[in-house]
Amino acid sequence: MELLTGHGLWPVAMFTVILILLVDLLHRRQRWASRYPPGPVPLPLLGNLLQVDLKNMQYSVHKLQQHYGDVFSLQMAWKHMVMINGLKAVREVLVNYGEYTADRPKIPIYEHGSLGPKARGVILAPYGPEWREQRRFSVSTLRNLGLGKKSLEQWVTDEAGHLCDAFKDQAGRPFNPSTLLNKAVCNVITSLIFARRFEYEDANLIRMLRLLEEALTNISGFIPEILNTFPVLLHIPGLFDKVFSGQKTFAAIVDNLLTENRRTWDPEQPPRGLTDAFLAEMEKAKGNPESSFNDQNLRMVVNDLFIAGTVSTSTTLSWALLFMIQYPDVQRRVQQEIDDILGPGRSPEMADQARMPYTNAVIHEVQRFADIAPLNLPCITSRDIEVQGFLIPKGTTLITNLSSVLKDETVWEKPLHFHPEHFLDAQGCFVKQEAFMPFSAGRRACLGEPLARMELFLFFTCLLQRFSFSVPAGQPRPSDHVVLGVLKSPAPYQLCAVPR
């Protein structure tokens, strides 16, 4: 009877509560297990590491999607992740659940090689006040410097003229256009950041692009994936500096440019470029330890803009010229539209884009078919979410497969073929498709998308206005084989640029 009264009742109540909680937890685990996305059975310790090709994750993801469906799970050692495929599921994750999928997981190789504890940047920064402050600053600064206005457009138009002059210097001889395209796009970025451009033969520009390519090569492939999976290896003395040597050297070049910019900065004058604007914000934020405007973050933001803004656009342009020599009928039709709208002498302007539906469709199809960034940067859930009927717990790493959207067979008429008509209606008017998302979507969509669109249209149209491109005599038609890295690049090829 003592158990039912006084102190004796307390242990019984505690035992009952604990039992109820344990039973509830068991049921919750069973529910999650039954509704958690399916996937290959993980091995002890290794998870699914031996069941995927870390050098070609896109292919592995495609094969697993065919077997498990649009939403499936992987376990990389002890790290759980869910792959999201197809337009419907990707939009659900990035747009419908945008507030809860905007954060980034920790990426050990970036944290170990950080430019400092306050160097968050924009691309890989955690979702929070600092990220919002820097994204807002970047967007507003680009707008103030002329994005969507004539000033920035004139910079790009002038650079397109320099690029065409460099193509003309090839005198119709075979050459690989990628190097010149890299230089032109890099000059647009340096104009935005430092309000300066380099001559194409400038040793500093050549070295900067070489180191940028090396840095991007360093962070892609098998070794970085292993180091991210087993970060304890990063503490092996000298390993990081050996594997990622290009990153540190590239950062040193950027530091030199920042030092020169700071030396010539006049705070009384309007900002010449993004660095001036950032320095002005640093002055305003003095004494505020919570501000994200500091020297370390300036370095990181500039590195982010170089990496995100240079190689992606130049790689897309390289694919565009490859497709023009592979599909000469498309090239001729683009040139006919250019001649009809611009004539032989007037340089293209962004205002012309609305009157050039076929050219616009071709540029969009280049981006869709080239598919240069098949797997999006990882994000992490900040709460439990339900996607396509599957329950995904808080703290799960998600990777959205943008390639599965750009090649979604339920959306595109000819997903595996180069077909500009994907973006034209029956009357020949341009139509943007919902499944066109090479810049991602949602809160983490690429902030440089408007600039990239401007560069693609002005560079591509200017080149097709002034040159006809062809396969060099005696050479086979180039293949569309890819070189895998951070981005999908075309295998090296040559073309002839004959002045029109």
Curated annotation (Swiss-Prot):
Cellular component terms per the entry's GO annotation: endoplasmic reticulum membrane
Documented EC number(s): 1.14.14.-
Q: Which cofactor does it need?
A: heme
Q: Which domain of life is it from?
A: Eukaryota
UniProt binding sites for heme: 446
Q: Which Pfam families match?
A: p450
UniProt lists the family membership as follows: Belongs to the cytochrome P450 family.
The protein depicted here goes by the name Cytochrome P450 2D28
